[in-house]
Amino acid sequence: MAITEKEREYLESLKEKIEGQLHGSGVKFSDREIEHISLLENRISQKIDEKLLIEKLSSIAKSNDPIDKSLYDKYDVKRGLRNANGTGVLVGLTSIGDVVGYEVKDGQKVAIPGRLIYRGYNVEALIKDAEEHNQFGYEQCAYLLLFGKLPTADELAEFNDLLGVHRTLPENFTEDMIMKAPSADIMNKLARGVLASYSYDPNPEDRSISNVLHQCIALISRFSTLTAYGYQAKRRYYDGKSMYIHNPLPELSTAENFLRLIRNNKAFTDDEAKLLDLALILHAEHGGGNNSSLTVHVVSSADTDTYSAIGAAVGSLKGRRHGGANIQVAEMMDNIKENVKDWSNENEVKSYLEKIANKEAYNRTGLIYGMGHAVYTINDPRATLLRDKAAKLAREKGLEEEYNLYKMVERFSPEILYNMHGDGKKICANVDLYSGFVYSMLNIPRELFTPLFAISRIAGWSAHRIEEIIAGGKIYRPAYKNISAEREYVPIEKR
């Protein structure tokens, strides 16, 4: 596809204008300079041609791929692997985690208070134990998820030592795999770091449980380092800011090391690290049906290597409908704060939320981010725990007005969404509503919100990969109904 005549005339006039200005000052284009202008013209022409071609091909793709929505009902398709009553389609069994938010009675979904269970233990009990003993609890949760039992003091100490040994990245990894190929998106950088780890593993294709466990423990340990270094590279090469590469300390917890690595002075308080540790515990596992954990099961069922399976899970978690939702909450709250003059005025806040739900404000999708969940109905226990902890930190930092704004969003949104949609579905705040606010109060940059989710969830992913290898046995192969008619092939000269 050639450059249009109008575009060519513009380029010619531009060239003549520049040449005329230079002639006026006694300067003329050299043959080499004229050649450069011609090359530039060709490059612009190629870019325009490519853009027009892509637009044309996109139009063809859009016109050929739509599917009549009525066909999903006709063929009883479980879209999103959901049943008509909102429950999930049963595709597997797991003993790792459970997400409880409803019961099914007489075929109907009945709302009940939310519970999050790790290997049979309520996550609230795990958090309470860590707080009572003034200890970091994420590492104990990782042990529990991997091995199905609570560790003794000696077992936990051995496990922490093992994690500490692996926190440092392999020799030359930082220089070759992070600094030489920085990324504007930390989740993409994390996925690449996971895949690159394959090349530094002497036995990457060994699928024995002992080797897979060794690989998973190394990844659990290194995720915080990979994320922090990816962030530092972004600061240097994309943000034009100073880059600080600190060594992780083996004696520190995951939360402590992460705060140490992202801050230029390596400083953090115990309260900051304990609050981040709480967030890591709450995000470590969420059953086998969430998108990224299911991805681990699906990809692992194909008998691929650990790095490919975990890298795929990182890609899933990055999605705006999954782990990326916490950033969307933060952006929505920015919009609310900009457009609501009086944050303490309930009527004004409620009115603006109604505009968002009615597609009249913010991004006009009608979604109030941080509200609603596939399983939780009355409450998301993770959101409840984070909300209570956020209250204390907000008081300490003088951010009570902003905290109360978040609470109003939680309080008003269920009624607003019910009135808008009227489908009878109970809606509660999910963990994303408060997680970003907590991270921002810890002075954690927004681009690290979703990577923090991954730093936590790698423990659950690892447990699900091992479970799939031990108990899976079959490759995932669900059915897709083809709805296109057969056609007679047409030779190219007759099309």
Regions picked out by a protein language model, each given a short descriptive name:
Residues A2-R495:
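Non-transmembrane, aqueous-exposed alpha-helical and coiled segments at domain scale
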